[in-house]
Swiss-Prot record:
Family, similarity comment: Belongs to the N-Me-Phe pilin family.
Residues modified as N-methylphenylalanine: 13
Phylogenetic placement of the source organism: Bacteria, Pseudomonadati, Myxococcota, Myxococcia, Myxococcales
Name the UniProt record assigns to this protein: Type IV major pilin protein PilA
Gene assigned in the entry: pilA
Summary of the knockout phenotype: Deletion mutants show loss of observable pili.
Stated consequence of mutating residue 193 to D: Pilus-minus S phenotype
Gene3D superfamilies assigned: Glycoprotein, Type 4 Pilin
Record-linked InterPro entries: N_methyl_site, Pilin-like, Pilin_PilA, T4P/T2SS_Core, Type_IV_major_pilin
Keywords, alphabetical: Fimbrium, Membrane, Methylation, Transmembrane, Transmembrane helix
């Protein structure tokens, strides 16, 4: 008996079937790739949270020895590892930032109120000249009357009846806008906005005043 060479089980895909498969893959990629990019950006935000907690611990340790806080990173021993995507603002006091744009960093001749992001590692175009975060969405709470002035408040002369407020600014997604964080030695609350979430913020807890990952291009 003659057997047909055209066994239905051996037939290939038709052009329409291939086009459907390609379309499905394209749809899945359109959904998955942006989510993956956002996941990567959120993982970069962990640097800011980790280093701000280290800054908080450094201030508390310094206070336990000196009965005061400090406006300067080098005085409290706050020095994030190289390769930092975020810059850090300890205070708004006079002085130059530690600019990380070279392999070797000069020994500071005075107090260092801020530390830049590592533009030597990420390139000159990544440099953040001023790592001062937006602070409008963080509201101090309690009867002590603390505010959002970066540094020791009211002044160092008021210590030990003093407190501190600090922050960070970076670029988590390599786009034009910044990702901003703050940390305080006092209680506060976050206010809902285009780029921020509402909620109580405990002392020593980093708060994302402008979430660059969640709202590219939106005004704060």
């Amino acid at each position: 008996m003659r057997v047909s060479r055209f066994n239905p089980r051996n037939r290939g895909f038709t052009l329409i079937e291939l086009m459907i498969v390609v379309a499905i893959i394209g749809i899945l990629a359109a959904i998955a790739i942006p989510n993956f990019i956002k996941f990567q950006a959120r993982s970069k935000q962990s640097e800011a949270k980790t280093n701000l907690k280290a800054l908080y611990t450094a201030q508390k340790s310094f206070f336990s020895e000196k009965d005061r806080y400090s406006d300067f990173a080098n005085e409290i021993g706050f020095a994030p590892e190289r390769g930092n995507r975020y810059g850090y603002r300890v205070s708004a006091a006079a002085g130059d930032c530690e600019v990380r744009n070279a392999a070797d960093l000069p020994v500071p001749a005075a107090g260092v109120p801020c530390i830049s992001n590592d533009s030597f590692r990420f390139g000159a175009n990544s440099a953040i000249d001023d790592p001062t975060p937006v602070v409008a969405r963080f509201v101090p709470q309690g009867a002590a009357g603390w505010n959002t002035t970066l540094g020791v408040q009211p002044t160092i002369a008021d210590c030990p009846n003093c407190n501190f407020f600090a922050g960070a600014r970076g670029n988590a997604d390599n786009e034009a806008t910044f990702d901003d964080w703050v940390i305080a030695g006092f209680e506060g609350s976050g206010q809902v906005g285009p780029c921020s979430e509402a909620g109580n913020v405990a002392s020593g807890t980093p708060y994302n005043t402008r979430n660059d990952v969640a709202c590219d291009g939106a005004a704060q």
